[in-house]
From Swiss-Prot:
Domain of life: Bacteria
Gene that encodes it: yhbQ
Alphabetical list of InterPro entries matching this protein: GIY-YIG_endonuc, GIY-YIG_endonuc_sf, UPF0213_domain, UPF0213_GIY-YIG_endonuc
Family membership: Belongs to the UPF0213 family.
SMART domains xref list: GIYc
Record-linked Gene3D superfamilies: GIY-YIG endonuclease (3.40.1440.10)
Protein known as: UPF0213 protein YhbQ
Domain GIY-YIG: start-end pairs: 2-77
Length: 100
């Protein structure tokens, strides 16, 4: 199973873009060359601000959604300290179903 990553890219005007991928460097290069998300095209210099492995695609999609719901301040804390990322991931883990 290929691991998935959550990443945040900072634009020249200090906005944070959140995405997921299986290859952070490849995806960052796509964004840099204008072949990534439309939201980042024409935004000037892009900087990879944060990336972390999250597990499978399903978990990555849920983590991306949750991070996109955070305030700018919370995202900045995540970038600066990784604040709460482990807790966020653990809250997204689905509990195992036990059979009798």
């Amino acid at each position: 199973m290929t691991p998935w990553f959550l990443y945040l890219i900072r634009t020249a005007d200090n906005k944070l873009y959140t995405g997921i991928t299986t290859d952070v460097e490849r995806r960052y290069q796509q964004h840099q060359s204008g072949k990534g998300a439309k939201a980042l095209r024409g935004k000037g210099e892009l900087t990879l601000a944060f990336s972390a492995p999250v597990g499978d695609r399903s978990l990555a999609l849920r983590a991306e959604y949750r991070v996109k719901q955070l305030t700018k301040r919370q995202k900045e804390r995540l970038v600066a300290e990784g604040a709460g990322f482990a807790k966020l991931l653990s809250s997204l883990q689905t509990p195992e179903i036990k059979s009798d």
